[in-house]
């Protein structure tokens, strides 16, 4: 009996110590998101991914979705099936301190069917749907060896607020006094309550497995409407704030501005900045040790037109999303290497090949942007607000100063995977890692 008790106590100590190692409270955790929506070759993806993992504490694989009929987890990696799940979790054999989580939603589980898009709310509404989801989560974690899951739940978005300056800004404020606020979700109070129920039930099911659960707060999701902060904090291990894309060319195609400033910018919505979001969660009694700051590895671009002027100083009038890059293939979105190559382009080149002019922020408050004014034919103008290694390091320093748990990079596929920018591979990720190293 005495030997059994000694064994039990030792076993319990090992479990507790292991968990302390995982959740060490310091601003040094790096969460690396990996979005595979453009991946077609599993082996190539793994080869490109592996060098980044020495800098990551957590790898968050995205994204899985939800079947709108069964409410079970489904793969969104069309053509890859579930093979890549096993390949991703097998990376832990080389990186034994790495924890690999499966992210659900992340604004990737989208269709043109409105009923299908509402499935994230419908799932919350009854116990049987929630149980189907939870059982499928348990099965996926056990089958493929994930260490847990990330809940990047797809709640309805706040409607865009168009940015204006000068007299138009004050006119808009006056008009807003007489406008009715749009109804985002008539049952938001019920969904808020049931989301807590889902997290409670998930936590109970994951605890015996020793699984981790994080929550990603996606851009433009109202925490006031959908997230009951205090009970949520009790059920998740980390809360990851996607503190970027405050303004995008799809939410407002007519005005280009900073998309992920640390602090409030003049002529900008005062809530559209990192410090505002962090303070909101802290004001609602969230422990700093649970908060993680999201940093993008890309830029958002707008088309400059003749009315945009030639200075590039934001806010500027724009003509819609900028041209798609050769990697992202998405209008209004450029990866870090697509931007850095244009900044260092030969100045003699013209047209779409012409270089971007970079404008840094010496205050470290708002971020960096680059632009190319229209040519004599009013063509090829572009303006992009983006993240680079220096600004990412600034945000890591901010996270440390606020005593947050760490930084999450969105995402590895947008970083300099092949070293095109001249600073080696994964230069944004390494800048975050090096910023934290200074404080050890």
Curated annotation (Swiss-Prot):
The keyword Disulfide bond applies. SMART domains: Glyco_18. Glycosylated. Disulfide bonds join 32-56, 340-421. GO terms for cellular component: extracellular region. Keywords: Developmental protein, Disulfide bond, Glycoprotein, Secreted, Signal. GO terms for molecular function: chitin binding; chitinase activity. Residues 1-27 form the signal peptide. Cooperates with insulin-like peptides to stimulate the proliferation, polarization and motility of imaginal disk cells. May act by stabilizing the binding of insulin-like peptides to its receptor through a simultaneous interaction with both molecules to form a multiprotein signaling complex. This is Chitinase-like protein Idgf5. It comes from Glossina morsitans morsitans. The lineage of its organism: Eukaryota, Metazoa, Ecdysozoa, Arthropoda, Hexapoda.
């Amino acid at each position: 009996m005495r030997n059994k008790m000694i064994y039990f106590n030792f076993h319990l100590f090992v479990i507790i110590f292991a968990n302390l190692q995982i959740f060490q409270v310091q601003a040094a955790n790096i969460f690396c998101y990996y979005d595979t929506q453009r991946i077609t070759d599993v082996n190539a993806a793994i080869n490109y991914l592996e060098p980044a993992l020495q800098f990551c504490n957590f790898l968050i694989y995205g994204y899985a979705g939800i079947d709108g009929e069964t409410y079970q987890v489904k793969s969104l990696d069309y053509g890859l099936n579930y093979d890549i799940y096993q390949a991703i979790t097998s990376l832990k054999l080389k990186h034994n301190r790495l924890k690999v989580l499966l992210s659900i939603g992340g604004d990737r589980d989208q269709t043109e069917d409105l009923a299908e898009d509402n499935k994230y709310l419908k799932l919350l509404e009854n116990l049987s749907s929630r149980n189907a989801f939870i059982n499928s989560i348990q099965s996926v974690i056990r089958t493929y060896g994930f260490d847990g899951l990330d809940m990047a739940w797809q709640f309805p978005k706040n409607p865009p607020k168009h940015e204006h300056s000068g007299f138009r800004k004050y006119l808009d404020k006056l008009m807003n006094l007489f406008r009715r606020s749009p109804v985002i979700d008539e049952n938001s109070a019920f969904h808020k309550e049931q989301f807590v129920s889902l997290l409670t039930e998930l936590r109970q099911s994951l605890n015996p497995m020793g699984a981790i659960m994080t929550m990603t707060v996606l851009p433009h999701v109202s925490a006031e409407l959908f997230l009951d902060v205090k009970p949520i904090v009790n059920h998740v291990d980390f809360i990851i704030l996607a503190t970027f894309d405050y303004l995008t060319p799809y939410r407002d195609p007519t005005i280009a501005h900073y998309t992920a400033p640390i602090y409030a910018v003049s002529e900008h919505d005062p809530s559209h900045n990192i410090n505002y979001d962090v303070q909101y969660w802290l004001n609602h009694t969230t422990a700093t040790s649970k908060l993680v700051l999201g940093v993008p590895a890309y830029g958002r671009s707008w088309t400059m037109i003749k009315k945009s002027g030639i200075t590039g100083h934001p806010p500027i009038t724009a003509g819609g999303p900028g041209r798609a890059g050769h990697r992202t293939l998405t209008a209004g979105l450029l990866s870090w290497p697509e931007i850095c190559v244009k900044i260092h382009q030969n100045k003699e080149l013209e047209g779409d090949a012409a270089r971007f002019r970079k404008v840094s922020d010496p205050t470290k408050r708002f971020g960096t942007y680059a632009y190319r004014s229209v040519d004599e034919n009013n063509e090829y103008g572009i303006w992009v607000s983006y993240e680079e290694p220096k600004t990412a390091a600034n945000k890591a320093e901010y996270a440390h100063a606020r005593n947050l748990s760490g930084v999450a990079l969105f995402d590895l596929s947008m970083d300099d995977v092949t070293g095109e920018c001249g600073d080696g591979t994964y230069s944004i990720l390494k800048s975050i890692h090096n910023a934290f190293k200074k404080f050890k």
